[in-house]
């Protein structure tokens, strides 16, 4: 079982090197570009070489990423963690006030960016111009051949900012141990796909349309690289149908707004626009049971995923295709402990975050004796109220 990004890198080089790793629509070529896992691994090593050359010992140092989904984004995010640094993927859609707060909090050694945010918010270059780097900066370096496992897989590896619906976003601290402990929640549902449908999931490709700062996109990318499947990247929802049409994809992680669009096409007889899409993993909110039931009747396999950034996306999943079970949370992660406290779901286990970055009080509000309280409401940890 692969339990770290370094082990995943080695797997790319030794077992799945000749498989297609990622595809995307290349605007300049006006067509699809792709890389195999062998090239993916080499570019990860190049990124490690870049960090070492520019910043020396990067263990524990933060590297911010502010860009749209791209192949380079993937390399920057995972290369950072393989090098022992901390990846900080930021939400390109936020304003300067929010981004400047998050950059000030995390104090990155560099900000990898594609220019879009800087064009919209000139204050980025004015304030952080000396540490801005292009997303493809690693391409000029030779691959580092002496990459090894990080010393501690329980150490901080990612800072993922929450949506911030009740004030400033909180920086969720996640380790590689958190990430890989959650992998069964993303891999096991595909055993159910085989059982229910008989489809050969070994040949599936997945369209990644959610931004990489979203926990679902990040964890899905890791899980698919473990199994050696192909990931098709969509960097802008306005090009969703173009990209879906250009890159055949069986699987997609969806949030409610995406599901509604897909549902509309299916119910209006426009399923051909979906180019073979047949498996939907639904997360981020409760979904209308009627929509799910209708999609199943039309031949889709639908899995409902329940998790938080604070649980590395883990929690529970419902892969039943029977209408009477659509409102159930389904299976839980048997490696974790669950309990209800005054109607609130609590969870303890290896996928649970390390805490909120530089926010011990906020951490204490939701974690009591390693037990995560899933409600965002403040409470007294002594009384759990």
Model regions: which residues?
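Conserved AMP-binding/adenylate-forming
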Residues: 33, 48-94, 209
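Conserved AMP-binding A3 loop
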Residues: 34-38, 157-184, 385
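Structural core segment of the AMP-binding/adenylate-forming
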Residues: 78, 82-143, 148-149
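Conserved small/polar residues in nucleotide/adenosyl-binding loops
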Residues: 162, 373-380
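Gly/Ser/Thr-rich phosphate-binding loop
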Residues: 250-254, 262-324, 337
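Conserved ANL (AMP-binding/adenylate-forming) active-site segment centered on the GW(Y/F)…HTG consensus within
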Residues: 323-326, 352-375
């Amino acid at each position: 079982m692969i339990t770290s990004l370094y082990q995943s890198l080695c797997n790319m080089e030794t077992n799945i090197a000749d498989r297609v790793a990622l595809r995307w629509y290349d605007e300049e070529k006006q067509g699809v570009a792709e890389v195999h896992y062998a090239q993916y691994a080499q570019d990860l090593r190049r990124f490690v070489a870049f960090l070492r050359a520019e910043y020396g010992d990067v263990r524990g140092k933060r590297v911010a990423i502010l860009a749209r989904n791209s192949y380079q984004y993937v390399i920057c995010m995972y290369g950072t963690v393989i090098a022992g640094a901390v990846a900080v993927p930021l939400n390109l859609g936020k304003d300067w006030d929010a981004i400047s707060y998050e950059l000030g909090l995390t104090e990155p050694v560099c900000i990898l960016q594609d220019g879009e945010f800087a064009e919209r918010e000139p204050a980025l270059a004015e304030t952080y111009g000396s540490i801005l780097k292009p997303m493809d900066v690693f391409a000029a370096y030779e691959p580092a051949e002496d990459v090894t496992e990080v010393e501690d897989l329980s150490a901080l590896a990612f800072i993922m900012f929450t949506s911030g619906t009740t004030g400033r976003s909180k920086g969720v601290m996640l380790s590689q141990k958190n990430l890989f402990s959650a992998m069964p929640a993303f891999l096991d549902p595909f055993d159910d796909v085989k059982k229910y449908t008989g489809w050969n999931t070994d040949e599936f490709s997945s369209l990644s349309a959610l931004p990489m700062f979203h926990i679902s996109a990040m964890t899905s990318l890791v899980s698919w690289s473990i199994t050696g499947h192909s990931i098709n990247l969509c960097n802008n929802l306005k090009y969703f149908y173009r990209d879906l049409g250009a890159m055949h994809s069986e699987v997609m992680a969806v949030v409610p707004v995406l599901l509604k669009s897909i549902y509309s096409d299916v119910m209006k007889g426009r399923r051909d626009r979906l180019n073979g899409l047949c498996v939907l993993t639904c997360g981020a909110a409760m979904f209308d049971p009627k929509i799910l039931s209708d999609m199943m009747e039309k031949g889709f396999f639908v899995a409902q995923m329940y998790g938080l950034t604070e649980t590395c996306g883990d929690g529970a999943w419902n892969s039943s295709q029977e209408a009477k079970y659509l409102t159930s949370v389904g299976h839980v992660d048997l490696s974790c402990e669950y309990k209800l406290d005054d109607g609130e779901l609590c969870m303890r286990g290896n996928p649970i975050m390390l805490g909120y970055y530089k926010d011990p009080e906020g951490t204490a509000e939701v974690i009591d004796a390693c037990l995560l309280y899933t409600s965002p409401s403040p409470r007294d940890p002594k009384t759990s109220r």
